[in-house]
Amino acid sequence: MSDHQDGMKLEDIERQFLDVAQREGGLEAIQPTTGPLENEENLKSSTGGGGGEDDNDRKKRKRSRSRDRDTRRRSRSRDRGERRGGGGGGDRDRSRSRERRRGGGGRDEPRRRGGDDEARSRREPEPQKPREPKKYRFWDVPPTGFETTTPMEYKNMQAAGQVPRGSVQSAVPVVGPSVTCQSRRLYVGNIPFGCNEEAMLDFFNQQMHLCGLAQAPGNPILLCQINLDKNFAFIEFRSIDETTAGMAFDGINFMGQQLKVRRPRDYQPSQNTFDMNSRMPVSTIVVDSANKIFIGGLPNYLTEDQVKELLCSFGPLKAFSLNVDSQGNSKGYAFAEYLDPTLTDQAIAGLNGMQLGDKQLVVQLACANQQRHNTNLPNSASAIAGIDLSQGAGRATEILCLMNMVTEDELKADDEYEEILEDVRDECSKYGIVRSLEIPRPYEDHPVPGVGKVFVEFASTSDCQRAQAALTGRKFANRTVVTSYYDVDKYHNRQF
């Protein structure tokens, strides 16, 4: 009875496994050739029936059936694992395809999404920051107390007399010895054979003191360099004023030779600047001479220091006098004389007709009947600046000439030259359309006309007039800008 029951139980278990296999669709994987019951009956028949079996035989059969069940169970587990993706590459690929179509990404999805984000970030540029106003390197160092005031607002305040006295910076630019080197040197030619630097240095220093030209104790001349092969020398002074005074030694006799004293070739009169070591007082009495100039049309609110600053943009003054009334207020005109006579014509050409506030300057020789000294310059001041002084600043044209802005040394370096070009173009573009811009540059040892001047061509005369009114009197590299109109034909023919 117990054997029969065991057989029935095994048959029920096997049937349950077959039902599960059919539902899984893998019946073919578990088709047993003989069931447990058949095996048992065959075993019984081979032994002559079940009655003669002993306990050992039953135990062996039970262990055998258990092993068979375990084997079949492991086989079915492997089959189900393969069908569910454990070993089927095709099913796994189809599963991933379904996931991608449904929006899933599997293991590679985070990496793919990261790539999309990266591509999207490349396609979508970052929002640009608002462009800050350009800070010019050269234009307008604002006076103390007016750091937040625009140049145009400051000029309008000046015209209205709203700028208090003493608010303008010192007229003496802050420059070092290297900047003024060319203005502190003199060329000495026809030097005697066999002279040495020490002897020449002692000779000139002695003559400076004997003639009363030294403006302070000590040696006015600091350095002497002799070129014996070409028979000339260069002497370097401690101050610009004493350098100018040293030109009086042209023709002096030294060791039997008559010396030639000249300015060096790279000297530019309009770019003369102060040496900080020389702060000699300017005489307040301007004596009548061929180089005395009259400055009229001055706004009454301008102080003496402000007028001197304007004049000193061309070079140091020998004497200056601003006419005032009994209350100390300006009468609107002044007289001046430059320490270097060669600057007289240049200053007249640059300042005459300049617009200051609501007034226009009138600058001319004060003593026209006096005989002029030979300054080695053309007699006509208009030939210096290329304008007609009889018409003030000249007839308005599309060409604006800006003077007293740049030095020859500043134009030699390419990077600095490009920066100056950019600064001037950007500033002039605020007042109209700039068609072209010319800043003549020095070329080795060859003289180039117009070096030190800036020429700007505007699209219309009205644009040029707006720029002229706005830029006159402005500061560029700590120099006061002087402006005038320029002939269109001369500009296009490059007659600078």
Swiss-Prot record:
SMART domains: RRM
Signal peptide: none
Residues annotated as domain RRM: 184-266, 291-368, 404-488
Biological-process GO terms, alphabetical: developmental growth; embryo development ending in birth or egg hatching; embryonic body morphogenesis; germ cell development; mRNA 3'-splice site recognition; nematode larval development; regulation of mRNA splicing, via spliceosome; spliceosomal complex assembly
SUPFAM superfamilies registered for this protein in UniProt: RNA-binding domain, RBD (SSF54928)
InterPro entries: Nucleotide-bd_a/b_plait_sf, RBD_domain_sf, RRM_dom, U2AF_lg
GO molecular function: poly-pyrimidine tract binding; pre-mRNA 3'-splice site binding
Record's GO cellular component terms: commitment complex; nuclear speck; nucleoplasm; spliceosomal complex; U2-type prespliceosome; U2AF complex
One family name in Pfam for this protein: RRM_1
Superkingdom: Eukaryota
Biased composition (Basic residues): 59-77
Predominant cellular place of this UniProt entry's protein: nucleus
UniProtKB keywords: mRNA processing, mRNA splicing, Nucleus, Repeat, RNA-binding
Subcellular location: Nucleus
Basic and acidic residues bias (residue ranges): 1-26, 78-96, 105-138
Annotated stretches, region: Disordered: 1-142
Description of how the protein assembles with itself and partners: Forms a heterodimer with the U2AF small subunit.
Cited function: Necessary for the splicing of pre-mRNA. Binds to the polypyrimidine tract of introns early during spliceosome assembly.
Name of the featured protein: Splicing factor U2AF 65 kDa subunit
Annotated source species: Caenorhabditis elegans
